[in-house]
Amino acid sequence: MATLIYVDKENGEPGTRVVAKDGLKLGSGPSIKALDGRSQVSTPRFGKTFDAPPALPKATRKALGTVNRATEKSVKTKGPLKQKQPSFSAKKMTEKTVKAKSSVPASDDAYPEIEKFFPFNPLDFESFDLPEEHQIAHLPLSGVPLMILDEERELEKLFQLGPPSPVKMPSPPWESNLLQSPSSILSTLDVELPPVCCDIDI
C-alpha cells in the first residue's frame, strides 16, 4: 500500500509526496525533497514507518505562507536595491532643496503683505442721500406715497399743501361703509359693459 507523507515547508505550505512503502523498506536510492526552494538529499529510512501527523487547516497556513513569502521576497530584493538607493536618495535631496528655494520667493509674490490691503466696506460706497439740487427735506412728506411728478405746477401744489392727515383724506369708493345699504354699495360697483352682439353666427 502507498502511504502519504506530508512534507511541511518552512513557509507553511504543506507539500504532498506519495512514496511507496516497499520502496522505503527496500532502500530504492536517495529521495529528493524540496524545502524552501532548496533541494535536499535524504537517505531512505529503514525500519517501521509511521503516518505523518495531520496537517493544519490550509487557511491558517496560507496566511502564514503569504507573510513568509513577502519577507522572503523583501530579503531577496534588498541586496540589489541597496546599491541604487543612495543615488536615488541624493537625487531626492537635491530636488527637495531646489523646491524649497523656489517656493520661498513664490510665496512672497503670491501673498503681498496684509498691511498693503485697504479694508473694503460696501456701506461706505452706498449713499442714500439726494444731491443738494434735489433736497426735499423741507417738504412734509410723512405718509405720502411714492409719486412721479411730470410738471412743475404739481410740485408747487405740494409746497402749498400742509401736513397730510388721515381725517381729511377721502375714502375710496370700494371701502364698505356700515351705514350704506347694499344697493348703494352695488351701484358703486356697476361697470358699463359693451352691448352684446347677437348677429354672430355660431
From Swiss-Prot:
Organism: Homo sapiens
The protein's name in its UniProt record: Securin
Domain topic, free-text comment: The N-terminal destruction box (D-box) acts as a recognition signal for degradation via the ubiquitin-proteasome pathway.
Tissues expressing the protein: Expressed at low level in most tissues, except in adult testis, where it is highly expressed. Overexpressed in many patients suffering from pituitary adenomas, primary epithelial neoplasias, and esophageal cancer.
Motif (D-box): 61-64
Membrane-traversing stretches: none
Coarse class of the protein's main subcellular location: cytoplasm
Subcellular location(s) per record: Cytoplasm; Nucleus
Motif (SH3-binding): 163-173
Sequence motif TEK-box 2, location on chain: 94-96
Single annotated GO MF: cysteine-type endopeptidase inhibitor activity
Annotated positions of the N-acetylalanine modification: A2
